[in-house]
């Protein structure tokens, strides 16, 4: 009897040392998965599109929630560091658009490729880099993903080609990456992203044409967040049906605020490209909470009420949270624990990003050539290694 009481005492003692929420989560039986109805995609030159129901596992749901919260908190921390003048220069935040970067990544393979414009922090994270590397890049430190030389608009990772500062210029590059996939006989696709503000660029239509001619495995993706800088899509485009703008290229319009819609549409598009049918176009209808950049307050061309309405009715993180809680895939307490862990991760990364040293001046000329540069050509001078004065 004494042994039994001692065993019970040890169990209770161990439980008392853990947070109450963790004890409750550990003792609760959650569903392994749940089926959800999702919004039907609008189609162009397609007889059928992505499914209108999808299964979400508890494991995937928790992973997506953590990733979206991480992107959200990372962007809010970047906002804070910018206002403290620790981050300088251009800075474009993607809070509100988390379902796009996380949902797209959930629909492809790590060996697939992705290229985007300058609102790239979220994609840099979902492609596999850490918050520490991203924030350190924003602050221009040696530990940044581009050694502190790229900043907000020029981040890179394996199979992630930026972060490009010229509006629309990444789209022909994405078609070129898809050409390389086909030329090398690899079962890979390239996600080529651009915004509604870039959608009227002539180079994009040229990329459409070549991709269709050569049947390239390229998924053209227009992130339609309703505004190109401060200009609404209705004032900028004669046709706002961006998923139809490829004309001869099939397209689909997707609810970009719903991660499950984005995931299923991406899986559909990737399968289409892998089958050898050529390119496809996706329009993700999304919304950014911040202004175009940090110099844009974001309320001169739209109202605060409009922003708040989207936050209250269509927030991608809240939508996933409600689904998971209501279907017994997770508890409110468990998701709150994730929130706490994410906040700590962001704070730790921010401390590193402010304490890490800046790259010395002599590294200014590094990482330009893949091998020893041909300085003897045309009498070019050797790079002079200046000593850093910082």
Curated annotation (Swiss-Prot):
Localisation per UniProt entry: Mitochondrion matrix
Protein activity control? Pyruvate dehydrogenase activity is inhibited by phosphorylation of PDHA1; it is reactivated by dephosphorylation.
Under Enzyme Commission nomenclature, its number is 1.2.4.1
Q: Which cofactor does it need?
A: thiamine diphosphate; Mg(2+)
* GO MF annotation terms: metal ion binding; pyruvate dehydrogenase (acetyl-transferring) activity
CDD domains membership: TPP_E1_PDC_ADC_BCADC
Keywords associated with the record: Acetylation, Carbohydrate metabolism, Glucose metabolism, Magnesium, Metal-binding, Mitochondrion, Oxidoreductase, Phosphoprotein, Pyruvate, Thiamine pyrophosphate, Transit peptide, Tricarboxylic acid cycle
Q: What is its main location?
A: mitochondrion
> Where, per the database record, does this protein carry N6-succinyllysine?
63, 244, 277, 313, 385
Interval spanned by the transit peptide: 1-29
Q: Which Pfam families match?
A: E1_dh
User: What positions does the entry give for Mg(2+) binding?
Assistant: 196, 225, 227
Using the record's annotations, give every residue carrying the modification Phosphoserine: 232, 293, 295, 300
State the coiled-coil residue ranges: none
UniProt's post-translational modification comment states: Phosphorylation at Ser-232, Ser-293 and Ser-300 by PDK family kinases inactivates the enzyme; for this phosphorylation at a single site is sufficient. Phosphorylation at Ser-293 interferes with access to active site, and thereby inactivates the enzyme. Dephosphorylation at all three sites, i.e. at Ser-232, Ser-293 and Ser-300, is required for reactivation. Acetylation alters the phosphorylation pattern. Deacetylated by SIRT3.
> In Gene Ontology terms, what is a biological process of this protein?
pyruvate decarboxylation to acetyl-CoA
Is Lyase tagged as a keyword? no
The entry's thiamine diphosphate-binding residues are: 118-119, 165, 167, 196-198, 225, 292
Known role:
The pyruvate dehydrogenase complex catalyzes the overall conversion of pyruvate to acetyl-CoA and CO(2), and thereby links the glycolytic pathway to the tricarboxylic cycle.
What name does UniProt use for this protein?
A: Pyruvate dehydrogenase E1 component subunit alpha, somatic form, mitochondrial
Which organism's genome codes for this protein? Answer: Pongo abelii
Q: Which gene encodes it?
A: PDHA1
């Amino acid at each position: 009897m004494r042994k039994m009481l001692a065993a019970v005492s040890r169990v209770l003692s161990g439980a008392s040392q853990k947070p109450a929420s963790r004890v409750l989560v550990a003792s609760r039986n959650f569903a392994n998965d749940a089926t959800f109805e999702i919004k039907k995609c609008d189609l162009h030159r397609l007889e059928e599109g992505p499914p209108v129901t999808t299964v979400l596992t508890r494991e995937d749901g928790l992973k997506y929630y953590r990733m979206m919260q991480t992107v959200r908190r990372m962007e809010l921390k970047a906002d804070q560091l910018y206002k403290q003048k620790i981050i300088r220069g251009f800075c474009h935040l993607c809070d509100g658009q988390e379902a796009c970067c996380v949902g797209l990544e959930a629909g492809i393979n790590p060996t697939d490729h992705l290229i985007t414009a300058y609102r790239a922090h979220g994609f840099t994270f979902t492609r596999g880099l850490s918050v520490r590397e991203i924030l350190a890049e924003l602050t221009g430190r040696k530990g940044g993903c581009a050694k502190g030389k790229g900043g907000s608009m020029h981040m890179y990772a394996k199979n992630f080609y930026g972060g490009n500062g010229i509006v629309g210029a990444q789209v022909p590059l994405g078609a070129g990456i898809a050409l390389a996939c086909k030329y090398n006989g690899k079962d890979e696709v390239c996600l080529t992203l651009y915004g509604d503000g870039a959608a009227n660029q002539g180079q994009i239509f040229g990329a459409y044409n070549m991709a269709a001619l050569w049947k390239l495995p390229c998924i053209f993706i227009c992130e339609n967040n309703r505004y190109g800088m401060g200009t609404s899509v209705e004032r900028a485009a004669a046709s706002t049906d961006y998923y139809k703008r490829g004309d001869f290229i099939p397209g689909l319009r997707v609810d970009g605020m719903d991660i499950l819609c984005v995931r299923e549409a991406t899986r559909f598009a990737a399968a289409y490209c892998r089958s050898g049918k050529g390119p496809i176009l996706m329009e993700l209808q999304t919304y950014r909470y911040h202004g175009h950049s940090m110099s844009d307050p974001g309320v001169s061309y739209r109202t605060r009420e409009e922003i708040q309405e989207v936050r209250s009715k269509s927030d991608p993180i809240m939508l996933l949270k409600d689904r998971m809680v209501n279907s017994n895939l997770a508890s409110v307490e468990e998701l709150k624990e994730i929130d706490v862990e994410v906040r700590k991760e962001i704070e730790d990364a921010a401390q590193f990003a402010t304490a890490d040293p800046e790259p010395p001046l002599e590294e200014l000329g590094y990482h330009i050539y893949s091998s020893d540069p041909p300085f003897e050509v045309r009498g070019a001078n050797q790079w002079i290694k200046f000593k850093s004065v910082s």
